[in-house]
Regions:
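Positively charged n-region of N-terminal signal peptides that target proteins for export
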Residues: 1-5
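General helical structural elements
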Residues: 6-7, 73
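Bacterial N-terminal signal peptides
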Residues: 7-16
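PEST-like low-complexity, intrinsically disordered acidic/proline/serine-rich tracts
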Residues: 21-246
Length: 246
């Protein structure tokens, strides 16, 4: 009985945390709030490879190197120079899959930079990135962190950086619960801390690809022998500021 009550309490606390992130302004998010949006939410998911028992929690996951912090502060003119932070080393390799075209993801990036000490005037410049209109596109990003196996990390990064963009179109797509898909339009290899970018059309047959009743959105990609990602996002949880964000 105690175990059941404890489990129920955890579920309630998690639900309350998610609700708080959606109701309070992003400018008031804590580091943990922003980290959860980036890595464990309707817009950001984590796929692990290896021993996930050493996976960093929300608190340790937002730590970053001094060099990374200084780099992000210096490059205020580029929206891409925003990061969620380097994670503490672990055995597992973590693929962070995020819907960059969703406002909460962009807001979380900028909020973390603000919390980490960027000058107010720089943060003000970055806020334009939060409100950016992605128009007719859905953009998914992938970043990697967490592994002490530098060889493995290097192999994966090389695969992501050198993948044939045209060949990738045959193995990369977004899929709804009903099985309908949109294929990859464009691939951009990682050139900044936002990671590799996968660009998809926002419409299918003249209608928005995602609607409130779509159930779920699945991102799938496969490249070479080392990269295979498949993550699902719950559409019912994508409402933010009265709008379906994806």
């Amino acid at each position: 009985m105690r175990r059941v009550l404890f489990t129920c309490s955890i579920v309630i606390l998690l639900a309350a945390s998610v609700s708080a992130q959606k109701t309070k302004p992003w400018t008031e998010w804590t580091a943990k709030d922003a980290d959860k949006i980036l890595n464990d939410s309707a817009w950001g998911q984590t796929q692990s490879e290896g021993d996930s028992s050493s996976r960093p929690d929300s608190t340790s996951a937002i730590t970053q190197t001094t060099a990374a912090r200084e780099s992000s502060v210096k490059n205020a003119g580029a929206a891409a120079n925003v990061e969620s932070g380097e994670k503490k080393a672990g055995v597992a390799l973590y693929y962070r899959v995020r819907l960059l075209s969703a406002k909460p993801i962009r807001a979380a990036f900028v909020r973390l930079i603000e919390i980490q000490g960027a000058p107010p005037e720089k943060v003000a410049q970055w806020r334009a990135f939060v409100d950016r209109d992605f128009g007719d596109y859905i953009v998914v990003t992938i970043t990697l962190d967490g592994s002490t196996d530098r060889k493995r990390m290097g192999m994966v990064m090389a695969e992501i950086g050198n993948v044939d963009a045209e060949a990738l179109k045959a193995t990369t797509y977004l899929e709804r619960k009903d099985g309908k898909r949109v294929a990859l339009m464009e691939y951009r290899a990682p050139t900044d801390v936002l990671g590799a970018k996968f660009v998809f059309p926002r419409t299918l047959d003249g209608k928005p690809f995602i609607a409130a009743d779509s159930g779920e959105l699945r991102f799938s990609t496969e490249a070479g022998k080392v990269l295979k990602i498949s993550k699902r996002f719950k559409v019912s949880e994508m409402m933010y500021e009265g709008k379906l964000e994806y």
